[in-house]
Each structure stands twice: as structure tokens, then as C-alpha cells.
Amino acid sequence: MDKAKKQELMAKHARHEGDTGSPEVQIALLTERINHLNSHLKEHKKDHHSRRGLLMMVGKRRGLLNYLMREDIERYRAIIKELGLRK
């Protein structure tokens, strides 16, 4: 993910100007990285080091989502819908 894409995601999901650390921003950035790594692993099936990284990122995102669900269910529902994480 290049710097411009990262800035775009941060601006889109930020709660206020200069927000880089809110759960929504972190979840959006992790989702982008997960999607990119997923496409990489479809082509390189035996890349187990990257697969482990993917699983760690998914776990980290899950933790952030759980935190957001506990703290503010409306923000949780909004980010889920926006990123299309649930069926």
C-alpha cells in the first residue's frame, strides 16, 4: 500500500482532523493490507511466512473490532457496513 492510498483511507475513516489511531482507521488500514495479502497468497500458495502474517493481521483486526463492539456498537456497525466485513 502506497502513502497516497494510506492517506486516503485515513482521511475517509478519521473521526477528526489528523486522526491516525482510532480503531476505525486501524481497521480500515488492516483490511486493505489483508485484502492485498490475500490476492498475493492466491498466486503464491506456498508462501507460508506471508500466510502467518495474514493470520496475525486478521487476529489484530478481530481484536480491534471486538473492542469497538464493546465500546460503541453504532461505530462498530458503521465500519462493518462500510468495509463489507460481514455477510
UniProtKB/Swiss-Prot annotation:
InterPro entries the UniProt entry points to: Ribosomal_uS15, Ribosomal_uS15_bac-type, uS15_NS1_RNA-bd_sf
Region span, Disordered: 1-23
Record's compositionally biased regions (Basic and acidic residues): 1-19
SUPFAM superfamilies assigned: S15/NS1 RNA-binding domain
Swiss-Prot/TrEMBL keywords: Ribonucleoprotein, Ribosomal protein, RNA-binding, rRNA-binding
Family: Belongs to the universal ribosomal protein uS15 family.
Purpose: One of the primary rRNA binding proteins, it binds directly to 16S rRNA where it helps nucleate assembly of the platform of the 30S subunit by binding and bridging several RNA helices of the 16S rRNA.
PANTHER family associated with the record: RIBOSOMAL PROTEIN S15, BACTERIAL AND ORGANELLAR, SMALL RIBOSOMAL SUBUNIT PROTEIN US15M
Protein's name according to its UniProt entry: Small ribosomal subunit protein uS15
